[in-house]
């Protein structure tokens, strides 16, 4: 015999759960639309989805903050690096298309691997690369990650941030590189980043892989924001002081050229 359930005992979904469900549904609808037709402005998204502009504005701001969307200089929205990683559309990014031209020029000069990376939380994420023809080379691929505090690409992006921002990314202060070098906490990292900022480029001598040298320069938009890092990776067996100087100089020129191509772009940093 079943026991009647009193009215006060009836199970119902809490308002907070209903609200969260609606919020997720709204967010996914915005992402679906951006995947199909971006870039779009707030008014266009609002009209297409039949949503209040204030709701669209709130959702898009959260997506931008989390790296799922980006906003251009005309305040239109497009998919961010996190969404592009899932959709496989990274090759369509304007910055990646422009990178191919700059990379070809650099390879013609030095025949060394050149990569494009963005900051993804506490890690540096490769979104494009062109490889050297040498049999001895860095073995990596698009989608690979390295600790931002240890890599040349990560450091060149972190150097554009304040100490407070960097400290928030690495709150525990335990900084050991993949090859076992232990930094003396955040103070040493801050010192390294200050030097990177002063030099205009970052270097890495065997901190992410034994036998590997890397140099990286920032790619900036017209506002001076760092969009990405342009990085070359060279086995230490092929590096001399003279060759290192030429590589860094030509990499800086390549970074400036790429910055000119993508001056209008917003940032791609994905925050956790």
Give short role names for the model-derived ranges.
Residues 2-96, 256, 260-264:
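N-terminal helix-turn-helix
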Residues 213-217:
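Short hydrophobic beta-strand micro-motif common in sensory/regulatory domains
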Residues 192-194, 199, 210-211, 226-272:
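Juxtadomain coupling helices with adjacent low-complexity linkers
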Residues 108-109, 206-211:
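Short loop/turn motifs at secondary-structure junctions and domain boundaries
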Residues 33, 48, 98-109, 115, ...:
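Amphipathic alpha-helical regulatory segments at dimerization interfaces
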Residues 75-173:
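Amphipathic alpha-helical effector-binding/dimerization core
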Residues 2-10, 135-208:
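Short, solvent-exposed recognition segments
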């Amino acid at each position: 015999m079943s026991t009647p359930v009193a009215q006060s005992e009836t199970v119902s979904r809490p308002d907070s759960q209903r609200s969260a469900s609606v919020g997720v549904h709204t967010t996914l609808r915005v992402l679906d639309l951006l995947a199909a037709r971006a870039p779009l402005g707030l008014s266009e998204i609002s009209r297409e989805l039949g949503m209040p502009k204030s709701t669209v504005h709130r959702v898009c701001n959260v997506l931008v903050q989390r790296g799922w969307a980006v906003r251009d200089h005309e305040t239109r929205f497009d998919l961010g690096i996190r969404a592009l990683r899932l959709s496989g559309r990274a090759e369509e990014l304007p910055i990646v298309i422009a990178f191919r031209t700059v990379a070809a020029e650099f390879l013609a000069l030095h025949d060394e691997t050149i990569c494009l990376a963005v900051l993804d939380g506490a890690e540096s994420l490769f979104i494009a690369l062109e490889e050297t023809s040498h049999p001895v080379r860095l073995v990596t691929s698009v989608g690979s990650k390295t600790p931002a505090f240890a890599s040349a690409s990560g450091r060149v992006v972190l150097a554009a941030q304040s100490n407070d921002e960097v400290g928030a990314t690495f709150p525990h202060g335990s900084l050991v590189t993949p090859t076992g070098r232990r930094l003396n906490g955040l103070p040493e990292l801050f010192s390294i980043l200050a030097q990177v900022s002063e030099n205009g480029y970052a270097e890495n001598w065997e901190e992410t892989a034994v036998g590997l040298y890397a140099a990286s320069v920032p790619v900036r938009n017209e506002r001076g924001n760092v969009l990405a890092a342009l990085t070359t990776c060279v086995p230490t067996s092929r590096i001399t002081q003279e060759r290192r100087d030429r590589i860094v100089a030509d990499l800086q020129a390549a970074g400036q050229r790429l910055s000119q191509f993508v001056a209008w772009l917003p940032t791609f940093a994905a925050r956790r």
